[in-house]
C-alpha cells in the first residue's frame, strides 16, 4: 500500500493504551519519538491515560472495574487535588470519539502500539471503533504481550505487523522499507501478515543501548510528568540504566527475554548503559524537565 515518498510525508501515530489515570511516560514512546523526529517523520500521539469512559470487561460478579471501585469505597487517583492542580485532570470527552477524530484528522500511514495483557483489549477496541473508510493505515504491535503471545496477536484482524523483542532497530528498518517500497516480509524481529500468509522472522542481536537516543516526551501533556508517591505528588522522569535483568524472578518477563534471545541470537538480552552515557542522560533530563524525583 506504500509508494516511495519523502520521510516527512510518512505519518506515524503512536497509540498509548495506558491504564486509566496512571501518569507514566514510557521509555519506549519517548525513544521512538526521538528516533522518528531525527528521521524526519511526521508523528503524533494518542494518550489514553486521562480518559474516564473506558469500557472494562465484566468480572465474575458482573461488575465493571469502576463499579467494583465504588463497591469497595476506594478513590480513583484523579481525586487527588494536588495532582489535579498540576495538570493531571481527567478528560470528559469520549475516548473512542477522540481516537476516531485523531485518525481522521492525522491520517496515519502507520499506527504503532505497545501492549501488555491489561492494555491489549483497549487497543483493539479503539482500532475497531475506526470506520472502515478511514482504515488506510497499517498497524504495528510491540511490547511484552505481542512478543510472548505473537501467535494470538497476529490473528487479530486489526494487527498487520508484530515486532518481537527490542524494537528500535527493526522498527526503523521497517519504516525505511515502507517509505522506499522495499520488501518487508524478511525483516528480523517481525511477524508480518500479507498475501494470505504469516511470515515469522527470528530475532536480531540486541543493540548497543548506549546509542539509543534520550527519550523525547514533548508530545505528552504536562500532567504526565507528575506522579503520586507516599502521599505526595512529584514531578518525575524515568531513566533506563539497563535493559533486561540478570535475575530469574518468576513473575517477570525479563528471564523470558534472556531465554528467547539466547535461543535465537546466542546472546542474552540483559545489557547495561555506561556511566558516561548515564551522566549525559541525567544532565539532559534535569535541564529539560526539572524533575523532583
Feature map (PLM): residue ranges:
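N-terminal [4Fe-4S]-dependent radical SAM core
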Residues: 2-8, 12, 187, 193-241
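Nucleotide-activated donor-dependent transferases that construct or modify glycoconjugates
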Residues: 10-21
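Glycine- and acidic-residue-enriched helix-capping/strand-helix junction motifs
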Residues: 20-29
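Glycine-rich beta-alpha loop elements in corrinoid/cobalamin-binding modules
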Residues: 28, 32-35, 42-54, 85-205
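Conserved C-terminal portion of the radical SAM core fold
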Residues: 38, 52, 110, 140, ...
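Glycine-rich, highly charged phosphate/nucleotide-binding loops
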Residues: 57-103
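Short glycine/proline-rich turn/loop motifs
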Residues: 78-81, 105-107, 257-266
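Radical SAM [4Fe-4S] cluster-binding motif and immediate context
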Residues: 210-293
